[in-house]
Amino acid sequence: MSEHLLLAPLLESYFRRRLTKQRNATPATMASYRDALRMLILFAATRLRKKPAALVLEELDRDLILAFLDELEEKRNNTIATRNARLAAIRSFFHHVAAADPASFGVAQRVLTIPIKRAHIEVTHHLTKAEVDALIEAPNPRTPRGRRDRTFLLFLARTGARVSEATGVNANDLQLERSHPQVLLRGKGRRDRVIPIPQDLARALTALLAEHGIANHEPRPIFVGARNERLTRFGATHIVRRAVAQAVTIRPTLAQKPISPHIFRHYLPHPTMSGTENASV
């Protein structure tokens, strides 16, 4: 192993070369991995009583990283999923270390043997058709906000889109004038796919675009908040919770389920969820 191999050059080459150029990582992935490694380095610096810039690779050994992961769970109250996400970033970095400096393969290999922690399997809740219909019909169709909420809920139910995909749709991602309308969803990790949409959703989207004066070819968001800016994840969650509060009097079973935008992905059947991969986008 290279003696006293400083972390700084390896970290720089990792983000500049491996993630950006080789892996074409998304900004979200870059930010997540950067946060994980920053937290690890600060933990190591505190534990070893050294400045972060003075840390060397061999000090980030298996035992130190296991202690870091334990602290995430025990002191920071991170979930197992978050702990595993941090470990994924660390393992990615050490894969780069092994390739960039073969002399450090041993220390990298020992870190790479740290296993992903298995989480308890939680019960997946599903919505019935009656519950979904009650949620979609809950918003007031006589108000602009109500019409937007209805269309957004209908979009989630008919496409099975992730909330980030639904809020990220622009008018020019829609093809509503085709005999078989469809939408381009921009997924995680640059995985885009084309999803067919039914006629009821196509009509609702057409009406929403017309109400806001948005042309089909414009790269403008179709779902916007009170300030006419793209709907956020928080805003999407608020729409769903507001619909639940209104619909629960009709469908009391809704009160027994943890409902968020994600639950619409478990509304079965969803023949459109897989979609068609669009590698050229």
From Swiss-Prot:
Tyr recombinase domain span: 122-281
Pfam families registered for this protein in UniProt: Phage_int_SAM_1, Phage_integrase
Domain Core-binding (CB) intervals: 5-98
Transmembrane intervals: none
Single Gene Ontology MF annotation: DNA binding
Active site, UniProt feature: 162, 188, 262, 265
Keyword line: DNA integration, DNA recombination, DNA-binding, Plasmid, Transposable element, Viral genome integration, Virus entry into host cell
Job description of the protein: Seems to be non-functional.
Family of the protein in this entry: Belongs to the 'phage' integrase family.
Protein name, as recorded: Putative integrase/recombinase y4rD
Organism: Sinorhizobium fredii (strain NBRC 101917 / NGR234)
